[in-house]
From Swiss-Prot:
It comes from the Bacteria. The FMN-N(5)-oxide reacts spontaneously with NADH to produce FMN. Requires the flavin reductase RutF to regenerate FMN in vivo. The keyword NADP applies. The gene is rutA. Its EC number is 1.14.99.46. It is an enzyme of class 1 (oxidoreductase). One of its GO terms (molecular function) is alkanesulfonate monooxygenase activity. FMN binds at I49, K50, N115, E124, R140, Y141, S190. This is Pyrimidine monooxygenase RutA. It catalyses: uracil + FMNH2 + NADH + O2 = (Z)-3-ureidoacrylate + FMN + NAD(+) + H2O + H(+); thymine + FMNH2 + NADH + O2 = (Z)-2-methylureidoacrylate + FMN + NAD(+) + H2O + H(+).
Length: 363
């Protein structure tokens, strides 16, 4: 099973809480995290894109770096780990993304890929005059289909004459082309999103579900496999989890309870309000799960809380789910979390038994 780190491009990572670690996103922080991840043989690092935050006492995600420029910098200071940036496709023409991706491919030596997102939070785009209207919710994957076709043309042949409803290319050129096949990833959980990933993505991200229920996402992975089978392609699921680990189950649980007690209700209210704006998509979209009050303090990603041995066991359960090819991990404290994962959790995982024993990173 592949292991990736979802780097904290926004302030405070993925905990909407006054009692969680409070920090700003910086290049130096993310460099330290990704270099540690590479040292411990993580397979990939991904950054999201967020253009407006949730506010509240913690000013959650009000402070964000930009994904492509961050990952270009990280590509230059790493040598093995795969690097993915996220394109907010309403803000960037596909020909520009194709050229930026080709540039980072050159920086990284063929280790770069692109995560495509359609956009769900209207204020991110409306503040720049780029929101196309609420009808976009129901046609966003039509838009993304044209977008990825332009990308594939330009990366594959260096030229595009694509003509569609949203994009018109007139002998558009991009050169040099990438040195390695450019992987495209997506995070669709709606039927339309999965159909898109089945046809165009190399793999699909999905949310884990619940607290210490590592296999609860299995129906989502099964839906993705069913959609991919219809296209004759192999598109695996990579599952998002937060790891909160400590020496004992009790110590880890105490941290989790403390984070929940400090939930930033004002920021969470913003998330709930924005999630209700999309009345066109189905109930199975990512944003619906993010705003569920069950575990909104960490956006309802699957959460693994326990001792190092308990977390290792639960991750092995994830690996056993049909269609699960990898996990994307967040941590309550990223620097400590990546290190303890590499030294205390990964060596106990049967699905990572092929990874050699790794000594502590030398500063």
């Amino acid at each position: 099973m592949k292991i990736g780190v979802f780097v904290p491009i926004g302030n405070n990572g993925w905990l909407i809480s006054t009692t969680a670690p409070q920090y700003m996103p910086t290049f130096e922080l993310n460099k330290a995290i990704v270099q540690k991840a590479e040292h411990y043989h993580f397979d990939f690092a991904l950054s999201m894109i967020k253009l407006r935050g949730f506010g509240g006492k913690t000013e959650f995600w009000d402070h964000n770096l930009e994904s492509f420029t961050l990952m270009a910098g990280l590509a230059a200071v790493t040598s093995r780990i795969q690097i993915y940036a996220t394109a907010a496709t309403l803000t960037l023409p596909p020909a520009i993304v194709a050229r930026m991706a080709s540039t980072i491919d050159s920086i990284s030596g063929g280790r770069f890929g692109v995560n495509l997102v359609t956009g769900w939070q209207k204020p991110e785009y409306d503040q720049m005059g780029l929101w196309p209207g609420d009808e976009y919710f129901s046609r966003r994957y039509e838009y993304l289909t044209e977008y990825v076709q332009v990308l594939r043309d330009l990366w594959g042949t260096g030229k595009s004459d694509f003509k569609g409803d949203y994009f018109t290319m007139n002998d558009c050129r991009v050169s040099p082309q990438p040195s390695a096949p450019m992987k495209v990833i997506c995070a669709g959980q709606s039927d339309a999103g999965m159909a898109f990933s089945a046809k165009y993505a190399d793999f699909n991200f999905c949310f884990g579900k619940g607290v210490n229920t590592p296999a609860a996402f299995a129906p989502t992975a099964a839906r993705m496999k069913e959609a991919a089978d219809k296209t004759g392609r192999d598109v695996g699921s990579y599952v998002l989890f937060m790891v909160i680990a400590d020496e004992t189950d009790e110590a880890a649980r105490a941290k989790w309870e403390r984070y929940k007690d400090g939930a930033d209700d004002e920021a969470l209210s913003w998330l709930t309000e924005q999630s209700q704006k999309d009345t066109r998509s189905g109930a199975d979209t990512n944003v619906r799960q993010m705003a569920d009050p069950t575990s909104a303090v960490n956006i309802n990603m699957g959460t693994l809380v326990g001792s190092y041995a308990s977390v290792a066991r639960m991750l092995d359960e994830v690996a056993a789910v049909p269609g699960a090819e990898g996990v994307l991990l967040t941590f309550d404290d990223f620097l400590t979390g990546v290190e303890t994962f590499g030294e205390r959790i990964q060596p106990l995982m049967q699905c990572r038994a092929h990874i050699p024993a790794i000594t502590k990173e030398v500063a």
